[in-house]
């Protein structure tokens, strides 16, 4: 019996049991914060005074959630306010006793929430980030009622900062260039914005974890990550949000991304494998060493994969480096160590399907870009925690990492240009990432394949609806990683692995490898069925002449 249904022992023999009042209150509280449905959309509500990094956190969190495949969108209340009030004059608009302005601000919030609802119901969004101050309990209660009416989950993120240096830096870096202050000098902007903050302080009611807000789900981030307070995390995605927010920081740093030096397989046009560096690849490694020495980067960490070409590149630097298996190149499965021409000849269906939707396509016995993103999530977390880092990796891995920092979607990610012997210098800034490309003037082959522009036949099964490869696997082991391309996406109709056999009727064409493999699979299946049917017939005859023993019962079952 659960603790919420415990009865008093003195009434246990009575026919009318009454639960303790304390247990009823505890049960009521549990229901008050539990979600309506496990998979309900989540509304993230930012809280905090101006210049506390709310928009920074909103955009960074949205970028991360979209990168891991959770559709997320920011709804910034300032954008709605500027639409309603075309010209901003002064901080007087934010005074709590300015009734007309208060009505406008509330109406803007309601319009934004309706857009949140439309995003969830019409655009299949999963998470919306409501980026506003939301400093009063009245405003937060209004948001909670809206969420309750629509069965949305709510998770609050409060940013608290009392460090004057951090606040001043935020104002100078972001607010001076705000659309609220066109053509104003810096001193006037600082003065007006500080007065705006004072207007909010008058009515600011922080989250109260001990009393008023103890049943809400939230995280308090204090002084840009010095301390955290987490309360009543409801589900998996909220725990992911908490984990991410506890890893990010705002200290200045630089991240360098580059591929290994040109390899022997690069020269041959082969993908995957574990070949060593070519002569030009070794020249790049020496040029990279010289570049790093000239930069004089403080406390630089160097990470590589566990493949030979990245290790050889790092060895030439003469510094300590760490090997990460999760930085290995995408697993091409049965296509490892093949050229694209060979893949097209041996596995034409696979080649066409990969061109159709490259992000979701999974190599037979290998990985997709979607798999690779999931594999690289710990790397992103560590990059967010660290200072200066150089990552020496591979083309597909580098694309995934760049897509995170540059906020690129699944359509763009597999086609990002990451040439050999080029360094990407990433410097996180207020609302994004500054990117510089550095060429070390060492020639290399071009391994990039542009996105195909040809139209695909309508009869071909889309990648996202295709559960399994038509291509036989390279080994007889049938226990393989399932090739489901999207969570919850099931085929519209059953997909037969023997579809290629239909082409044989009425046509004298040589069988492809796909057809041969499918024919062999059919032959084995028929033999197995014949054996099973024959076995059942023998058992039926024996059963008529003798009483079945335990052994035969077991066999028959």
UniProtKB/Swiss-Prot annotation:
The modification Phosphothreonine is found at residues 471, 478. One of its GO terms (biological process) is fructose metabolic process. Residues 1-16 have a biased composition (Low complexity). ATP binds at residues 48-56, 170-175, 351-354, 395-399, 431. GO terms for cellular component: cytosol; nucleoplasm. Residues 252-557 are annotated as: Fructose-2,6-bisphosphatase. Pfam families: 6PF2K, His_Phos_1. Residues 1-21, 449-495 are annotated as: Disordered. The modification Phosphoserine is found at residues 32, 469, 486, 496. GO terms for molecular function: 6-phosphofructo-2-kinase activity; ATP binding; fructose-2,6-bisphosphate 2-phosphatase activity; kinase binding; protein kinase binding. In the C-terminal section; belongs to the phosphoglycerate mutase family. This is 6-phosphofructo-2-kinase/fructose-2,6-bisphosphatase 2.
């Amino acid at each position: 019996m659960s603790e919420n249904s415990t009865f008093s022992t003195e009434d246990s023999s009575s026919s009318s049991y009454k639960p303790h009042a304390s247990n009823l209150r505890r049960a009521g509280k549990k229901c008050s914060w539990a979600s309506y449905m496990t998979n309900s959309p989540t509304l993230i509500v930012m809280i905090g005074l101006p210049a506390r990094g709310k928009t920074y956190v909103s955009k960074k969190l949205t970028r991360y959630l979209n990168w891991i495949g959770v559709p997320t969108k920011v709804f910034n209340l300032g954008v709605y306010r500027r639409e309603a009030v075309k010209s901003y004059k002064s901080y007087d608009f934010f005074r709590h006793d300015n009734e007309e302005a208060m009505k406008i601000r509330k109406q803007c919030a309601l319009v934004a929430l309706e857009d949140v609802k439309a995003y969830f119901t019409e655009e299949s969004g999963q998470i919306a980030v409501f980026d506003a101050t939301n400093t009063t309990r009245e405003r937060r209660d209004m948001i909670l009622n809206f969420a309750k009416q629509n069965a949305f989950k709510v998770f609050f993120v409060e940013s608290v900062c009392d460090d004057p240096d951090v606040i001043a830096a935020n104002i100078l870096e972001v607010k001076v260039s705000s659309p609220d202050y066109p053509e104003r000098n810096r001193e006037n902007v600082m003065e007006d914005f500080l007065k705006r903050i004072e207007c909010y302080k008058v009515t600011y009611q922080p989250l109260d974890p001990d009393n008023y807000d103890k049943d809400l789900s939230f995280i308090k981030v204090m002084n840009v990550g010095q301390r955290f307070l987490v309360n009543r995390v409801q589900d998996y995605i909220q725990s992911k949000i908490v984990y991410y927010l506890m890893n990010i920081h705002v200290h200045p740093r630089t991240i360098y991304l580059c591929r290994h030096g040109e390899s022997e397989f690069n020269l041959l046009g082969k993908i995957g494998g574990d070949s060593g560096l070519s002569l030009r690849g070794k020249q790049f490694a020496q040029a990279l060493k010289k570049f790093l020495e000239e930069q004089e980067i403080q406390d630089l960490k160097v990470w590589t994969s566990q493949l030979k070409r990245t290790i050889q590149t790092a060895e030439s630097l003469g510094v300590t480096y760490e090997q990460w298996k999760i930085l290995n190149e995408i697993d091409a499965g049965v296509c490892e160590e093949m050229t694209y021409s060979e893949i097209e000849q041996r596995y034409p269906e696979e080649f066409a399907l990969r061109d159709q939707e490259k992000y979701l396509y999974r190599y037979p016995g290998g990985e997709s870009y979607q798999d690779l993103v999931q594999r690289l999530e710990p790397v992103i977390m560590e990059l967010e925690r660290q200072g200066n880092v150089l990552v020496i990796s591979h083309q597909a891995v580098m694309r995934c990492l760049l897509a995170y920092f540059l906020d690129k979607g699944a359509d763009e990610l597999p086609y990002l240009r990451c040439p050999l012997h080029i360094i990407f210098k990433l410097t996180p800034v207020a609302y994004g990432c500054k990117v510089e490309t550095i060429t070390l003037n060492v020639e290399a082959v071009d391994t990039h394949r542009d996105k195909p522009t040809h139209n695909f036949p309508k009869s071909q099964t889309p990648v996202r609806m295709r559960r399994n490869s038509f291509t036989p696997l390279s080994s007889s082991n049938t226990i393989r990683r399932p090739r489901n391309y999207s969570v919850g996406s099931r085929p519209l109709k059953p997909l037969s692995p023997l579809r290629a056999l239909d082409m044989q009727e009425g046509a004298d064409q040589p069988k492809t490898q796909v057809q041969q493999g499918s024919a062999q699979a059919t032959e084995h299946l028929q033999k197995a069925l014949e054996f099973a049917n024959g076995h059942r017939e023998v058992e039926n005859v024996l059963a008529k002449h003798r009483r079945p023993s335990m052994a035969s019962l077991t066999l028959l079952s």
